[in-house]
């Protein structure tokens, strides 16, 4: 720890959330509005862990950067802010994967799970860390873990490689509602892409994907064909735009084949085309199909 950072909690004004929440039985938990932390892996089999300073709650143990949520702050924003403040994690350098929520009724702790979008080295930026380290997955259990993180780690570890994908048959979805889309197919595709981009940023409830935990952020691929290929929207993570050179169905099958081969899944294909449904579900047990209404209801 740098010499210029003396031991003890940071001085100065604090957010109203930096206080103890108390349950009806007298149980206390830090964070008046709940708390959140970030579990980030580097895509190479390591996770970023924090060795907690002795004066902190469960000091001397290893866990993830995190802390009390600020007033009116959502859990994802809180986790990214805390990890930036404590460990120098770049807030724009994390691809969200899922959230796991511990709910005690009067208080919640949200573990936000992400993957580093680009390499970075953590930096001790405040008084709350003795050390920060990228720890190989196989060595996490060898450390003295914070009790809360230790209890959640087995389930989090088991899901570390789950990578859901949603593939959208744009022609089928756009054509499912007679709203005049045939007069401007490119414009209709752009409107669909705007909605998908908003949905991708918000994530999907885990149950929608048949997964555990609270919420997931899949990778989305929207396949355009014909005149819709003239849509102005470009690929912007986590939404990929594929402009099919020929058959849109063939392009969707190629996207799903590549996802399955890469070990990604579950893969959800949004289409009402029966022939396409049969082709994609034959590619693997992890491939599911939803109709256009499923997507439209969420848009």
Please place each PLM-identified region on the residue numbering.
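Acidic, metal-coordinating catalytic segment for phosphate/diphosphate chemistry
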Residues: 2-37
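Short beta-strand scaffold segments in enzyme catalytic cores
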Residues: 36-40, 112
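Entry beta-strands of beta-propeller and related beta-repeat scaffolds
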Residues: 46-47
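A conserved beta-turn-beta hairpin within the catalytic core of GNAT-like acetyltransferases
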Residues: 56-60
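Short histidine-centered catalytic/ligand-binding loop motif
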Residues: 62-72, 181
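Short hydrophobic beta-strand that contains or immediately precedes a catalytic carboxylate
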Residues: 64, 167-168
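Unchanged
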Residues: 68-162
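Nuclease catalytic cores that cleave nucleic-acid phosphodiester bonds
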Residues: 163, 175-299
């Amino acid at each position: 720890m740098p010499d210029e950072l003396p031991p003890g909690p940071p001085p100065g004004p604090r957010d109203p959330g930096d206080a103890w929440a108390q349950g009806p039985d007298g149980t206390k938990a830090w964070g008046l509005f709940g708390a959140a932390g970030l579990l980030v892996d580097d895509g190479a089999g390591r996770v970023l862990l924090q060795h907690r300073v002795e004066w902190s709650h469960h000091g001397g143990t290893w866990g993830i950067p995190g802390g009390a949520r600020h007033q009116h702050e959502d859990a994802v924003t809180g986790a990214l802010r805390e990890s930036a403040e404590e460990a120098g994690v770049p807030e724009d350098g994390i691809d969200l994967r899922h959230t796991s929520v511990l709910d005690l009724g009067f208080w919640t702790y949200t573990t936000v799970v992400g993957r580093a979008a680009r390499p970075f080295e953590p930096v001790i930026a405040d008084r709350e860390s003795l050390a920060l380290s990228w720890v190989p997955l196989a060595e996490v259990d060898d450390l003295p873990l914070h009790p809360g993180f230790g209890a959640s780690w087995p389930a989090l570890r088991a899901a570390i490689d789950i990578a859901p994908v949603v593939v959208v048959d744009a022609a089928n979805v756009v054509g499912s509602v007679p709203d005049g889309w045939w007069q401007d197919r490119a414009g209709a595709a752009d409107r669909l892409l705007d909605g998908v981009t908003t949905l991708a940023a918000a994530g999907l409830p885990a149950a929608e994907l048949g997964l555990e935990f609270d919420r997931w952020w899949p990778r989305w691929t929207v396949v355009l064909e014909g005149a819709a290929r003239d849509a102005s929207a470009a690929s912007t993570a986590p939404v990929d735009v594929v402009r099919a050179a020929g058959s849109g169905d063939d392009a969707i099958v190629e996207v799903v084949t590549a996802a399955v081969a890469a070990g990604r899944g579950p893969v959800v294909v949004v289409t009402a085309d029966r022939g396409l449904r049969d082709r994609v579900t034959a590619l693997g047990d992890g491939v599911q199909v939803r109709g256009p209404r499923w997507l439209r209801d969420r848009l």
